[in-house]
Amino acid sequence: MRILHTSDWHLGQNFYSKSRAAEHDAFLSWLLARAQEHEVDAIIVAGDIFDTGSPPSYARELYNRFVVQLQQTGCRLVVLAGNHDSVAMLNESRDILAFLQTTVVANAGCPPIELPRRDGTPGAIFCPVPFLRPRELVISQAGHSGREKQQQLLHAISDYYQEQYQQACALRGDRPLPVIASGHLTTVGASKSDAVRDIYIGTLDAFPAQHFPPADYIALGHIHRAQVVGGCEHIRYSGSPLPLSFDETGKAKSVHLVSFSDGRLSAVETLEVPVTQPLAVIKGDLAAITAQLEQWRGVEQDPPVWLDIEITTEEYLHDIQRQIQALTEDLPVEVLLVRRSREQREKILLNAQRETLSELKVEEVFERRLALTEIDDEKRARLHELFAHTLHTLTAEDENA
């Protein structure tokens, strides 16, 4: 039995006003080829197949086309909902996709299922655990402390997994079949990136790995960096196939090819996803940034590299942005983000705490507030325009009063 474990596709993501359609299309074509090459029996997508609950039409088209193409290979598809996914939207096509060897599990309550091999013989028992919404598991009661609510949710998730595992064992009987489980949540010690949202805000920070049942493999989603959980080789995050924030650059993206034999886990191979849209982060003062930009001088690069430029000086971002624009005009790069480093933002905030509003001009207050916000050039220019117009209007009113 072979499965491909993947997650966090985030189809339809808008990346600083840029579409990821071409990247996702290339990834799905690559994934389809790997499923055929390795004669995979099932692909498990552990949540966040879409980036929003109302994905654009092209994202739905990519999803539906992949289902049809995969069905023609004899490989099954299991789609679990993540915290970004809409239960209602996924359930819209669930019954139709079932005829195309695709199982969609959008919410809690789905019992374990049998995953067949390509030849139709039983291959594994699967516990299809999607993102578990607190309202599906616990009843909120007035008067409970934050600690009590945290423990209540922790026990509810643990109990749900144990119940799934017991049902899976009953379904397996004495057959030598592996038990596979899924999940879409943060585990204790997992390394997160900027694009990962907290999903149990105010109740549960992370789920302890020791509370998972003794399944042969646990395919997790939600964390965008591929990693083993708690030193347990059979509990893994596949990570996202694309970098979903600039702080995810520099590390390869992948899916896991998981093999079972004699009812047990036998091997996990990491398959690296090819890069179709390069991203890069450069940091420093203007001189350092100028030097780093030279690495693309004379390079033929298509598509252009998407850049995040982090400024480590106290100069006005607006002035630096104009200089960076001039520096990059003839380079195969596209600057999506210019921002201050976190250290500089904290320093500005600290200095601001020692000042009063009466010491600052209105324009300075606006610029400092803008410096703390990560937005693209187009929005920044629009905000400057709106601010200037508003200030002019107010000044004119004062003069005419």
State what each model feature region is.
Residues Q71-V79, P303-W306:
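Short, surface-exposed connector motifs at secondary-structure boundaries
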Residues D8, L28, I43, D48, ...:
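Divalent metal-coordination and catalytic microenvironments
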Residues P111-G123, V129, Y237-V299:
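Binuclear metal-dependent phosphoesterase catalytic core
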Residues L62-G74, L204-P214:
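Catalytic-core regions built around general acid/base machinery
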Residues P55, H84-H234:
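His/Asp/Glu-rich metal-coordinating catalytic cores
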Residues E37, A42, F260-A401:
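Accessory, non-catalytic peripheral segments of nucleic-acid enzymes
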Residues M1-V68, Q72, E385, H389, ...:
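N-terminal active-site segment of His-dependent metallophosphoesterases
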